């Protein structure tokens, strides 16, 4: 098999991953719109997930493309796999093989692992490395690098399959996962 099958779906955490709220005003995270456009061009279904109630989630998601569906957790909370499976059902996904979850939220990443998905941790938006805090802004570049390194280690200790600093690196990460799938690796 020369090429790994196309990705079945990519699930994203909403808060911190796709949307940042600076001073209470939501805006797309750096690289979010380009990443979503690239996946859409390749016809990879995408959906966002969040554990906020639906009105709060929709308020944040209004800065994202209208074509992007979302799923707010109903019932069983993360890290149970239910939300990931429900999001995949909302996309009419027929299989788990080739599904990827991207987030900096450890509970959502654990949910993805429990659901049998490939998982990509976002170090810069994980709680271990909170970019929106005043403390983060006060750090020197070296201290920020150390914090990102610690966040990377914390995310890998959860069991995630890959860790990237930001969404701009997702395309290369997906290529790496495709290579791993080509070799027969499973999540």
Where are the regions that the model predicts?
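Asp-based, Mg2+/Mn2+-dependent phosphohydrolase catalytic module
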Residues: 1-44, 49, 54, 61-100, ...
């Amino acid at each position: 098999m020369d090429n790994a099958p196309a990705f079945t779906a990519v699930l994203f955490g909403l808060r911190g991953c796709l949307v940042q709220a600076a001073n209470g005003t939501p805006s797309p995270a750096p690289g979010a719109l380009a990443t979503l456009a690239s996946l859409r061009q390749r016809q990879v279904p995408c959906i966002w997930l969040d554990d906020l109630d639906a009105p709060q989630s929709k308020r944040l998601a209004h800065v994202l493309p209208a074509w992007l569906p979302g799923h707010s957790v109903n019932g069983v909370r993360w890290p149970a796999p239910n939300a990931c499976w429900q999001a995949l059902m909302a996309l009419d996904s027929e299989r788990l093989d080739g599904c990827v979850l991207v987030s900096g939220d450890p509970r959502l990443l654990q949910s993805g692992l429990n659901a049998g998905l490939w998982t990509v941790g976002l170090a810069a938006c994980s709680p271990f490395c909170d970019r929106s805090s005043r403390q983060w802004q006060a750090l020197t570049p070296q201290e920020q690098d150390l914090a990102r390194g610690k966040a990377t280690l914390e995310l890998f200790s959860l069991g995630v399959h890959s860790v990237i600093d930001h969404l701009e690196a997702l395309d290369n990460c997906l290529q790496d996962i495709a290579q791993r799938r080509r070799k027969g690796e499973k999540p």
